[in-house]
Regions:
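Beta-sheet entry/capping signal
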Residues: 53-57, 96-98, 150-152, 160-163, ...
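Bergerat-fold GHKL ATPase/HATPase_c domain
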Residues: 1-101, 109-114
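An acidic- and aromatic-residue-enriched active-site/binding cleft used to recognize and process polar
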Residues: 42-45, 60-63, 102-105, 113, ...
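Flexible phosphate/Mg2+-sensing switch loops adjacent to catalytic phosphate-binding sites
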Residues: 51-61, 66-74, 162-212, 223
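Extended, regular secondary-structure scaffolds
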Residues: 74-82, 97, 151, 159-195, ...
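N-terminal assembly/transducer modules of large multi-domain enzymes
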Residues: 2-6, 10-11, 26-35, 45-49, ...
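Glycine-rich, often proline-containing surface loops adjacent to acidic residues and nearby aromatics
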Residues: 17, 93-99, 106, 245-258
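Flexible ATP-lid and adjacent glycine-rich G1/G2 motifs of the Bergerat
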Residues: 81-179
Length: 504
């Protein structure tokens, strides 16, 4: 009989109750849907196999206790011991779940028998997803790289549980192409009473998995928790129980059981459009959201504008539509259609007061575009100098301006399609502004400065602090770009007027 396994807490174990899910709730990530959508899609984009756009499917479904009871065997007593309220859910006949599946991706690669991370970081996602916490095989150049994104799934489940199904591409990868399946739960430390009157205390982590001896390596012959493989019926049982679409296509499928009522189809559609509308509009991503009745919405480059227009009317809705239009306009520009500022002297501390950044001719071009109500694109060169090798690599960001009927609007920042939603930047008057960071060098620099929720940049993160020349100053320089570009252009006109007045 298949059952869940939890490890008894030993004398050397810490009394640890995980809190990682709490880090994904911020001012701009207000709903469970936002957490799941932002984390899952950024991981899917990072896992792009290179064969074309990434496709992600979210589905909301209903499960019954009778049809899924075997998948939860041995779990409920641990859930109830950890959280009495969550344990009561075992008596309910029906429950809601959400599935997240990606296609056009690599799946969780790596040897499933690598229980200690000996295979290193490269192409070893299975180890980092299943066996590691707070560690990742990614770098700052990728959209997510803290190794805790999976906790958004666990946090969304009222029993802190998920099921994982993955298939891998390639010609005979170690551990096979799959599909591989495993259940994971992260509860609290909990105590279970035994019939003899004694009790056992268990650590938070539980698995629905095979426990069998390893077949090779330094730990050959020792028992380990391993996923169910293609020779087991478990991948098919999980697929059938939760109506997963994956057969043997490379990629990752995650099931989040027992989700709360507020995680709905409408919230998922709204969150995808809000957080990834620009990336979808570019053609790099397509998303389908399916509800409990089979009704679905597809968000792709052909439909994203219509989906945005179909959202509930609000200032945010119009803002998203205008941002999409501005971003798509900017994406098609050539060098002669944008203004490229000068390179900042490397020996000077980053400052928008530096004279060589903007010529008088460029300032006039910017003012003329603003006066005529046209869209405007400005490219800003940014030097990246890691202390590790002291070699400067020039990168850039693009700022797009467009007319707005709103008096003052806050600039919005996108790093490789991900909306960095809480960047503190001064508002601009009468204009909409987007800062687009797609170049890998600057994306890696700023990605290293992001926390686990990827909503702001800070020079104090462990992956950023002390790693770059003038690192903190360049972050401030990027934040201030929209306001400072306009200030420089307008101050040049004021200087010109003063000179004319003096001559007169």
């Amino acid at each position: 009989m298949t059952t869940w396994f939890f490890t008894p807490r030993g004398l050397m174990h810490k009394d640890r109750d995980p809190v990682l899910g709490e880090f994904f709730t911020t001012d701009s990530i207000k709903t469970i849907a936002d957490s799941i959508v932002r984390e899952s899609i950024q991981n899917s984009i990072d896992a792009n196999s290179g064969s074309g756009p990434v496709f992600v499917r979210f589905a909301v479904g209903h499960g019954s206790r009778a049809e899924t009871e075997d998948l939860f065997s041995g779990l409920w007593e641990h859930v109830g011991a950890s959280d009495e309220g969550a344990g009561l859910l075992s008596a309910e006949n029906n429950f809601r779940y959400v599935t997240v599946e990606d296609f056009g991706t690599t799946g969780l690669r790596g040897d499933p028998e690598d229980v200690m991370g000996n295979a290193g970081d490269k192409e070893n996602e299975f180890y980092f997803f299943v066996r590691a916490e707070g560690r990742s095989s990614k770098s700052g150049a990728t959209r997510g790289s803290w190794g805790v994104g999976k906790y958004t799934y666990l946090d969304a489940s009222m029993i802190n549980t998920m099921f994982v199904l993955t298939a891998r591409g390639g010609n005979g990868p170690v551990g096979g192409n799959g599909p591989l399946a495993i259940g994971m739960a992260v509860l609290k430390n909990h105590r279970i009473e035994n019939p003899d009157g004694r009790s056992d205390i268990y650590t938070p982590d539980g698995y629905l998995a095979e426990v069998r001896p390893l077949t090779g390596g330094d730990y050959a012959g020792e028992d380990a928790i391993l996923p169910f493989g293609a020779d087991s019926d478990m991948p098919e049982r999980i697929r059938a129980a939760f109506n997963l679409q994956r057969r043997d296509e490379p990629g990752l499928s995650v099931v989040v059981p027992y989700v709360p009522a507020e995680l709905t189809y409408d919230e998922l559609v709204r969150s995808v459009a809000r957080n990834y509308g620009i990336l979808i509009g570019s053609g790099e991503l397509a998303v389908t959201v399916v509800d409990e009745t089979g009704n679905e919405t597809t968000l792709d480059s052909d439909s994203i504008r219509a989906v945005l227009e179909g959202l509930e009317a609000s200032p945010e809705q119009q803002e998203l539509i205008d941002e999409l239009s501005l971003a798509l306009w900017g994406a098609g520009l050539t060098a002669e259609n944008r203004t490229e500022l000068g390179e900042h002297p490397l020996e000077n501390m980053p400052s928008w007061q530096t004279d060589v950044l903007m010529t008088e001719e460029q300032a006039k071009t910017i003012r003329d575009a603003l006066t005529s109500g046209e869209n405007l694109a400005v490219r800003v060169p940014i030097p990246i100098t890691p202390h590790a090798d002291a070699v400067t690599r020039w990168s850039y960001l693009d700022v797009f301006f467009g007319p707005s009927e709103t008096k003052r609007t806050r600039p919005h920042f996108y790093r490789q399609g991900l909306r960095i939603s809480e960047v503190k930047s001064e508002s601009v008057s009468g204009l909409r502004s987007l800062v687009i960071i797609n170049d890998p060098e600057l994306a890696a620099f700023l990605g290293a400065a992001e926390g686990v929720s990827h909503v702001e940049w800070s020079a104090t993160t462990a992956r950023f602090a002390g790693k770059y020349a003038y690192g903190q100053n360049w972050i401030a320089f990027v934040r201030g770009a929209p306001h400072q570009i306009l200030r420089r252009a307008r101050s040049a006109e004021e200087d010109e007027d003063r000179e004319l007045a003096t001559d007169y």
